[in-house]
Amino acid sequence: MASKRKHQASQKVKEESFKKHTLDSDEEDSDDYEREYLNDSDIEGGEEGVAKVEDDVKVTPFNMKEELEEGHFDKDGHYHWNKETEAKDNWLDNIDWVKIGTQKNAFDPAKDEENSSDEEKNEPVGKAFNLSMNLMKMVEFMKPGETVKMTLQRLGKQRPVLTTLQRIKQKKAGIVDPKTQEISQLTELANEILSKTGNMDIYQDTYESIKAKIADLPGTSKPKVADDIDMYADDFETKELERSKTSSSDSSKPTTTTSEVTWEFKWSQDETDIQGPFSTEKMLKWSQENYFKNGVYVRKCGENTNFYTSNRIDFDLYL
Protein backbone atom coordinates (compact mmCIF):
# COMPACT_ATOMS: atom_id res chain seq x y z
CA MET A 1 0.00 0.00 0.00
CA ALA A 2 2.82 2.40 0.83
CA SER A 3 4.51 1.82 -2.52
CA LYS A 4 1.19 2.39 -4.31
CA ARG A 5 0.69 5.73 -2.53
CA LYS A 6 4.20 6.83 -3.48
CA HIS A 7 3.51 5.94 -7.11
CA GLN A 8 0.26 7.95 -7.11
CA ALA A 9 2.01 10.96 -5.53
CA SER A 10 4.81 10.95 -8.09
CA GLN A 11 2.28 10.60 -10.91
CA LYS A 12 0.41 13.64 -9.58
CA VAL A 13 3.62 15.72 -9.53
CA LYS A 14 4.35 14.76 -13.15
CA GLU A 15 0.83 15.79 -14.22
CA GLU A 16 1.18 19.18 -12.48
CA SER A 17 4.57 19.83 -14.08
CA PHE A 18 3.17 18.83 -17.47
CA LYS A 19 0.29 21.28 -17.07
CA LYS A 20 2.74 24.12 -16.73
CA HIS A 21 3.94 23.66 -20.34
CA THR A 22 0.76 23.85 -22.40
CA LEU A 23 -0.47 25.85 -25.38
CA ASP A 24 -2.06 28.29 -22.96
CA SER A 25 1.34 29.07 -21.43
CA ASP A 26 2.79 29.68 -24.92
CA GLU A 27 -0.02 32.11 -25.65
CA GLU A 28 0.75 33.90 -22.39
CA ASP A 29 4.42 34.22 -23.44
CA SER A 30 3.39 35.67 -26.78
CA ASP A 31 1.15 38.16 -24.99
CA ASP A 32 4.11 39.24 -22.88
CA TYR A 33 6.21 39.66 -26.04
CA GLU A 34 3.53 41.82 -27.65
CA ARG A 35 3.36 43.96 -24.53
CA GLU A 36 7.16 44.47 -24.51
CA TYR A 37 7.69 45.02 -28.25
CA LEU A 38 5.81 47.21 -30.72
CA ASN A 39 4.62 45.70 -33.98
CA ASP A 40 4.47 47.46 -37.33
CA SER A 41 0.71 47.81 -36.93
CA ASP A 42 1.16 49.63 -33.61
CA ILE A 43 3.11 52.47 -35.28
CA GLU A 44 0.71 55.08 -36.63
CA GLY A 45 1.28 57.27 -39.67
CA GLY A 46 3.09 54.66 -41.79
CA GLU A 47 2.63 54.76 -45.57
CA GLU A 48 2.34 51.79 -47.90
CA GLY A 49 4.05 51.45 -51.26
CA VAL A 50 7.55 51.17 -52.67
CA ALA A 51 10.25 53.71 -53.47
CA LYS A 52 9.92 55.56 -56.78
CA VAL A 53 11.71 58.30 -58.71
CA GLU A 54 10.01 61.59 -59.53
CA ASP A 55 11.94 64.29 -61.43
CA ASP A 56 15.27 62.55 -60.69
CA VAL A 57 14.43 62.55 -56.99
CA LYS A 58 14.03 59.26 -55.13
CA VAL A 59 10.84 59.30 -53.05
CA THR A 60 10.36 56.64 -50.38
CA PRO A 61 7.17 56.02 -48.41
CA PHE A 62 7.27 57.05 -44.78
CA ASN A 63 7.28 53.85 -42.75
CA MET A 64 9.46 51.91 -40.33
CA LYS A 65 9.97 48.74 -42.39
CA GLU A 66 13.73 49.21 -42.84
CA GLU A 67 14.18 49.96 -39.15
CA LEU A 68 12.17 46.90 -38.09
CA GLU A 69 14.39 44.71 -40.26
CA GLU A 70 17.48 45.87 -38.32
CA GLY A 71 15.92 45.96 -34.85
CA HIS A 72 12.71 46.58 -32.87
CA PHE A 73 10.93 49.16 -30.69
CA ASP A 74 10.07 48.45 -27.07
CA LYS A 75 6.82 49.40 -25.36
CA ASP A 76 8.28 52.83 -24.44
CA GLY A 77 9.20 53.60 -28.06
CA HIS A 78 12.97 53.08 -27.66
CA TYR A 79 14.76 51.47 -30.61
CA HIS A 80 17.02 48.42 -30.05
CA TRP A 81 19.36 46.87 -32.62
CA ASN A 82 19.26 43.13 -33.18
CA LYS A 83 22.40 41.66 -31.64
CA GLU A 84 22.89 39.13 -34.41
CA THR A 85 23.08 41.94 -37.01
CA GLU A 86 25.20 44.29 -34.92
CA ALA A 87 27.64 46.27 -37.07
CA LYS A 88 31.30 45.67 -36.36
CA ASP A 89 34.45 47.40 -37.52
CA ASN A 90 36.24 45.23 -40.07
CA TRP A 91 39.68 46.20 -38.79
CA LEU A 92 38.93 44.59 -35.42
CA ASP A 93 38.81 41.16 -37.08
CA ASN A 94 42.48 41.45 -38.06
CA ILE A 95 43.75 42.03 -34.50
CA ASP A 96 45.35 39.14 -32.64
CA TRP A 97 44.24 39.97 -29.09
CA VAL A 98 46.11 36.98 -27.64
CA LYS A 99 49.36 38.28 -29.11
CA ILE A 100 48.69 41.77 -27.76
CA GLY A 101 47.99 40.41 -24.27
CA THR A 102 51.31 38.55 -24.17
CA GLN A 103 53.43 41.47 -25.32
CA LYS A 104 55.98 42.76 -22.83
CA ASN A 105 55.04 46.39 -23.44
CA ALA A 106 51.30 45.81 -22.98
CA PHE A 107 49.55 48.65 -21.18
CA ASP A 108 49.33 48.23 -17.43
CA PRO A 109 47.04 50.71 -15.59
CA ALA A 110 49.18 50.32 -12.47
CA LYS A 111 52.18 51.66 -14.42
CA ASP A 112 50.44 54.56 -16.12
CA GLU A 113 53.31 57.01 -15.59
CA GLU A 114 55.92 54.55 -16.86
CA ASN A 115 53.86 53.80 -19.95
CA SER A 116 53.42 57.50 -20.75
CA SER A 117 57.13 58.17 -20.37
CA ASP A 118 57.99 55.20 -22.59
CA GLU A 119 55.65 56.52 -25.28
CA GLU A 120 57.41 59.89 -25.21
CA LYS A 121 60.81 58.21 -25.53
CA ASN A 122 59.66 55.95 -28.36
CA GLU A 123 58.02 58.82 -30.28
CA PRO A 124 59.74 59.16 -33.67
CA VAL A 125 62.07 62.14 -33.96
CA GLY A 126 60.78 63.00 -37.44
CA LYS A 127 57.32 63.68 -36.03
CA ALA A 128 58.34 66.93 -34.33
CA PHE A 129 55.58 69.31 -33.33
CA ASN A 130 55.50 72.49 -35.42
CA LEU A 131 53.15 75.14 -34.05
CA SER A 132 53.14 77.44 -37.07
CA MET A 133 52.51 74.51 -39.43
CA ASN A 134 49.52 73.39 -37.36
CA LEU A 135 48.11 76.92 -37.29
CA MET A 136 48.52 77.34 -41.05
CA LYS A 137 46.67 74.07 -41.69
CA MET A 138 43.85 75.15 -39.36
CA VAL A 139 43.39 78.46 -41.20
CA GLU A 140 42.77 76.53 -44.44
CA PHE A 141 39.50 75.19 -42.97
CA MET A 142 38.38 78.50 -41.45
CA LYS A 143 36.71 81.66 -42.77
CA PRO A 144 37.27 85.28 -41.65
CA GLY A 145 35.47 86.07 -38.41
CA GLU A 146 35.08 82.43 -37.42
CA THR A 147 36.44 80.73 -34.33
CA VAL A 148 37.65 77.14 -34.47
CA LYS A 149 34.44 76.05 -32.74
CA MET A 150 32.28 77.92 -35.28
CA THR A 151 34.20 76.30 -38.14
CA LEU A 152 33.51 72.84 -36.73
CA GLN A 153 29.82 73.70 -36.40
CA ARG A 154 29.69 74.94 -40.01
CA LEU A 155 31.35 71.80 -41.33
CA GLY A 156 28.99 69.68 -39.24
CA LYS A 157 25.94 71.32 -40.85
CA GLN A 158 27.35 70.61 -44.32
CA ARG A 159 27.42 66.88 -43.74
CA PRO A 160 24.67 64.99 -45.62
CA VAL A 161 21.69 63.82 -43.58
CA LEU A 162 21.64 60.02 -43.74
CA THR A 163 19.37 57.41 -42.25
CA THR A 164 20.75 54.91 -39.79
CA LEU A 165 20.69 52.19 -42.44
CA GLN A 166 22.57 54.38 -44.94
CA ARG A 167 25.27 55.16 -42.37
CA ILE A 168 25.71 51.46 -41.65
CA LYS A 169 26.02 50.65 -45.36
CA GLN A 170 28.61 53.41 -45.89
CA LYS A 171 30.59 52.25 -42.87
CA LYS A 172 30.64 48.66 -44.13
CA ALA A 173 31.72 49.85 -47.59
CA GLY A 174 34.49 52.02 -46.10
CA ILE A 175 33.03 55.26 -47.52
CA VAL A 176 34.10 58.39 -45.59
CA ASP A 177 32.27 61.68 -46.05
CA PRO A 178 34.69 64.55 -47.00
CA LYS A 179 33.17 66.94 -44.46
CA THR A 180 33.49 64.35 -41.71
CA GLN A 181 37.14 63.92 -42.66
CA GLU A 182 37.73 67.70 -42.50
CA ILE A 183 36.16 67.82 -39.04
CA SER A 184 38.49 65.05 -37.86
CA GLN A 185 41.57 66.79 -39.28
CA LEU A 186 40.72 70.18 -37.74
CA THR A 187 39.94 68.60 -34.37
CA GLU A 188 43.22 66.66 -34.43
CA LEU A 189 45.23 69.83 -35.16
CA ALA A 190 43.50 71.79 -32.38
CA ASN A 191 43.93 68.98 -29.84
CA GLU A 192 47.63 68.68 -30.67
CA ILE A 193 48.14 72.40 -29.98
CA LEU A 194 46.15 72.09 -26.76
CA SER A 195 48.22 69.15 -25.48
CA LYS A 196 51.62 70.47 -26.60
CA THR A 197 51.31 74.15 -25.65
CA GLY A 198 48.58 74.03 -22.98
CA ASN A 199 46.46 76.59 -24.88
CA MET A 200 43.02 75.77 -23.44
CA ASP A 201 41.37 78.55 -25.48
CA ILE A 202 42.39 77.20 -28.89
CA TYR A 203 38.76 76.46 -29.85
CA GLN A 204 37.85 80.10 -29.10
CA ASP A 205 40.70 81.53 -31.22
CA THR A 206 39.46 83.45 -34.25
CA TYR A 207 40.67 83.35 -37.83
CA GLU A 208 42.33 86.75 -37.41
CA SER A 209 44.08 85.90 -34.13
CA ILE A 210 45.51 82.69 -35.61
CA LYS A 211 46.77 84.62 -38.66
CA ALA A 212 48.45 87.11 -36.30
CA LYS A 213 50.13 84.27 -34.40
CA ILE A 214 51.44 82.82 -37.66
CA ALA A 215 52.94 86.17 -38.63
CA ASP A 216 54.45 86.54 -35.16
CA LEU A 217 55.85 83.02 -34.90
CA PRO A 218 58.09 81.57 -37.62
CA GLY A 219 57.57 77.92 -38.46
CA THR A 220 60.91 76.19 -38.00
CA SER A 221 63.81 78.54 -37.46
CA LYS A 222 67.05 77.02 -36.20
CA PRO A 223 70.33 78.78 -35.65
CA LYS A 224 72.41 78.51 -38.78
CA VAL A 225 75.62 76.53 -38.51
CA ALA A 226 78.51 77.49 -40.73
CA ASP A 227 79.51 74.82 -43.23
CA ASP A 228 82.75 73.11 -42.34
CA ILE A 229 85.55 73.47 -44.89
CA ASP A 230 86.83 70.22 -46.27
CA MET A 231 90.62 70.30 -45.91
CA TYR A 232 90.95 67.57 -48.53
CA ALA A 233 89.02 69.49 -51.17
CA ASP A 234 90.77 70.93 -54.20
CA ASP A 235 89.73 74.50 -53.40
CA PHE A 236 90.62 74.29 -49.71
CA GLU A 237 93.33 77.01 -49.89
CA THR A 238 91.06 79.40 -51.80
CA LYS A 239 88.18 79.03 -49.35
CA GLU A 240 90.49 79.34 -46.35
CA LEU A 241 92.00 82.54 -47.77
CA GLU A 242 88.56 84.07 -48.38
CA ARG A 243 87.49 83.08 -44.90
CA SER A 244 90.53 84.72 -43.30
CA LYS A 245 89.98 87.91 -45.33
CA THR A 246 86.37 88.09 -44.22
CA SER A 247 87.27 87.61 -40.57
CA SER A 248 90.03 90.25 -40.76
CA SER A 249 87.72 92.78 -42.42
CA ASP A 250 85.08 92.16 -39.77
CA SER A 251 87.62 92.67 -37.01
CA SER A 252 88.82 95.95 -38.55
CA LYS A 253 85.30 97.40 -38.51
CA PRO A 254 84.35 99.46 -35.47
CA THR A 255 82.64 97.20 -33.01
CA THR A 256 79.16 98.29 -32.10
CA THR A 257 78.42 96.59 -28.84
CA THR A 258 74.76 95.79 -28.59
CA SER A 259 73.47 94.44 -25.33
CA GLU A 260 70.33 93.04 -26.97
CA VAL A 261 69.72 89.44 -25.90
CA THR A 262 67.88 86.98 -28.11
CA TRP A 263 66.30 83.72 -27.08
CA GLU A 264 65.49 80.33 -28.51
CA PHE A 265 63.14 77.72 -27.07
CA LYS A 266 61.62 74.31 -27.58
CA TRP A 267 58.27 72.96 -26.39
CA SER A 268 59.65 69.98 -24.45
CA GLN A 269 63.03 68.90 -23.12
CA ASP A 270 63.22 65.96 -25.56
CA GLU A 271 62.22 68.11 -28.56
CA THR A 272 64.79 68.44 -31.34
CA ASP A 273 62.99 71.26 -33.16
CA ILE A 274 64.28 74.62 -31.82
CA GLN A 275 62.26 77.83 -32.29
CA GLY A 276 63.96 81.21 -32.53
CA PRO A 277 65.72 83.54 -32.28
CA PHE A 278 63.25 85.88 -30.55
CA SER A 279 63.79 89.20 -28.84
CA THR A 280 63.43 89.67 -25.09
CA GLU A 281 60.44 91.97 -25.65
CA LYS A 282 58.59 89.26 -27.55
CA MET A 283 59.37 86.58 -24.97
CA LEU A 284 58.19 88.91 -22.20
CA LYS A 285 54.98 89.67 -24.10
CA TRP A 286 54.21 85.98 -24.59
CA SER A 287 54.87 85.27 -20.91
CA GLN A 288 52.60 88.13 -19.76
CA GLU A 289 49.84 86.99 -22.13
CA ASN A 290 50.13 83.49 -20.66
CA TYR A 291 50.88 82.09 -24.10
CA PHE A 292 53.21 79.48 -22.60
CA LYS A 293 50.71 78.11 -20.10
CA ASN A 294 52.78 75.06 -19.20
CA GLY A 295 56.08 76.82 -19.84
CA VAL A 296 58.72 76.14 -22.49
CA TYR A 297 62.43 75.37 -22.30
CA VAL A 298 64.51 78.48 -23.03
CA ARG A 299 68.14 79.49 -23.41
CA LYS A 300 70.05 82.48 -24.80
CA CYS A 301 71.05 82.34 -28.43
CA GLY A 302 74.73 81.63 -28.99
CA GLU A 303 75.20 79.83 -25.69
CA ASN A 304 75.86 76.11 -25.77
CA THR A 305 74.10 75.48 -22.47
CA ASN A 306 71.13 73.52 -21.25
CA PHE A 307 67.55 74.67 -21.73
CA TYR A 308 65.70 75.89 -18.65
CA THR A 309 61.98 76.29 -18.04
CA SER A 310 60.64 79.74 -18.87
CA ASN A 311 58.64 79.83 -15.63
CA ARG A 312 61.89 80.46 -13.72
CA ILE A 313 63.21 83.24 -15.99
CA ASP A 314 62.39 86.92 -15.42
CA PHE A 315 62.67 88.48 -18.88
CA ASP A 316 62.32 91.99 -17.38
CA LEU A 317 65.91 91.78 -16.17
CA TYR A 318 67.25 91.53 -19.73
CA LEU A 319 65.53 94.65 -21.12
Swiss-Prot record:
Residues 25-47 have a biased composition (Acidic residues). It is found in: Nucleus. Disruption phenotype: Embryonic lethal. Embryonic wound healing defects. The few adult escapers show subtle rough eye phenotype and extra and/or misplaced or missing macrochaetae on the scutellum. One of its GO terms (cellular component) is nucleus. Residues 1-57, 105-124 are annotated as: Disordered. Residues 12-24, 109-124 have a biased composition (Basic and acidic residues). The modification Phosphoserine is found at residues 25, 30, 41. Keywords: Developmental protein, Nucleus, Phosphoprotein. Residues 260-316 form the GYF domain. Pfam families: GYF (PF02213). Gene3D superfamilies: 3.30.1490.40. PROSITE patterns: GYF. The modification Phosphotyrosine is found at residue 37. One of its GO terms (biological process) is chaeta development. Required for embryonic epithelial tissue repair, but not for the assembly of the actomyosin cable at the wound edge. Probably acts downstream of rl in the regulation of Ddc and msn transcription to promote wound healing. This is CD2 antigen cytoplasmic tail-binding protein 2 homolog. It comes from Drosophila melanogaster (Fruit fly). The lineage of its organism: Eukaryota, Metazoa, Ecdysozoa, Arthropoda, Hexapoda. The gene is holn1.
